[in-house]
Curated annotation (Swiss-Prot):
It comes from Mus musculus. Residues 1-34 are annotated as: Disordered. Residues 1-10 have a biased composition (Low complexity). Disulfide bonds are present. One of its GO terms (cellular component) is sarcoglycan complex. The keyword Disulfide bond applies. Residues 89-320 are extracellular. It comes from the Eukaryota. Belongs to the sarcoglycan beta/delta/gamma/zeta family. The chain crosses the membrane at residues 68-88. Residues 23-34 have a biased composition (Basic and acidic residues). It is a single-pass type II membrane protein. This is Beta-sarcoglycan. The lineage of its organism: Eukaryota, Metazoa, Chordata, Craniata, Vertebrata. Its main location: membrane.
């Protein structure tokens, strides 16, 4: 402190009376003070070089684990991208010259240039699937049916059958002439079998009239039981009408049954009772079939042997 005061006094004296010469002792004291101050300033900015005192740099702890997860995720995405690229290159065959398997046109047409293996095809609204001109469009199912479906309408092509399911009907027409070949719109078009179709197999048919060509017969065949029912009657007309069945024939009508023409019944096919049976024995009720002169058929219950058709309540009137 004394040295500092002396230096300050000397400075003031030098500033007021001009430069003052210092002694050797004063110069040594001043030099020592300067070195001491310099050393103290150097130590103030000194940092010990110890591992524990250094600032830790880099990703450590949770940040390091998160960085590893991000790197692994990027690696997985790169592998998936590589697999997708290989599939696109192998299936679509995209190369330096373009795509070898398909073509994209400005009109929106997608053309396949080779055999394509697909599962389900969903065309867009009002789209068309077709083949090239003068070439067939071949659609093949590998041990599976080929199904064309739009809403509730479905066309299924299987190995042994082809089925069409529709709630509103169907029609077939020539794509070139647009002539209707077959239609189920009975109110507008009469039902005709297409050319080459000889038989129609249905479980149930509701129609006003069933006819055949003038040069062919109309045959109705069933494996089990056939029921022909009309809301206002059933009329069967033909040159010759034959019924062949292995079981019973049942004719029911609310008013009457009219057989107009020659009616032939083969007695060899009719069941007959044994000659030894009594007329009144057992639970059987027997009837005799009788005919009037005008062709009216009626039945008479058999109550005794050698009984004829002459009964009082027969519908023939005076003529039997």
């Amino acid at each position: 402190m004394a040295a500092a005061a002396a230096a300050a006094a000397a400075t003031e004296q030098q500033g007021s009376n001009g430069p003052v010469k210092k002694s050797m002792r004063e110069k040594a004291v001043e030099r020592r003070n300067v070195n001491k101050e310099h050393n103290s300033n150097f130590k103030a900015g000194y940092i010990p070089i110890d591992e524990d005192r250094l600032h830790k740099t880099g990703l450590r702890g949770r940040k390091g684990n998160l960085a590893i997860c991000v790197i692994v995720l990027l690696f997985i995405l790169a592998v998936i991208n590589l697999l997708i690229t290989l599939v696109i290159w192998a299936v679509i065959r995209i190369g330096p010259n373009g795509c070898d398997s398909m073509e994209f046109h400005e009109s929106g047409l997608l053309r396949f240039k080779q055999v394509s293996d697909m599962g389900v095809i969903h065309p867009l609204y009002k789209s068309t699937v077709g083949g090239r001109r003068n070439e067939n469009l071949v659609i093949t199912g590998n041990n599976q049916p080929i199904v064309f479906q739009q809403g509730t309408t479905k066309l299924s092509v299987e190995k042994n059958k082809t089925s069409i399911t529709s709630d509103i009907g169907m029609q077939f027409f020539d794509p070139r002439t647009h002539n209707i070949l077959f239609s189920t719109d009975y109110e507008t078009h009469e039902f005709h079998l297409p050319s080459g179709v000889k038989s129609l197999n249905v479980q149930k048919a509701s129609t006003e009239r069933i006819t055949s060509n003038a040069t062919s017969d109309l045959n109705i065949k069933v494996d089990g039981r056939a029921i022909v029912r009309g809301n206002e009657g059933v009329f069967i007309m033909g040159k010759t009408i034959e019924f062949h069945m292995g079981g019973d024939v049942e004719l029911k009508a609310e008013n009457s049954i009219i057989l107009n023409g020659t009616v032939m019944v083969s007695p060899t096919r009719l069941p007959s009772s044994s000659s030894g049976d009594q007329s009144g024995s057992g639970d059987w009720v027997r009837y005799k079939l009788c005919m009037c002169a005008d062709g009216t058929l009626f039945k008479v219950q058999v109550t005794g042997h050698n009984m004829g058709c002459q009964v009082s309540d027969n519908p023939c009137g005076n003529t039997h």
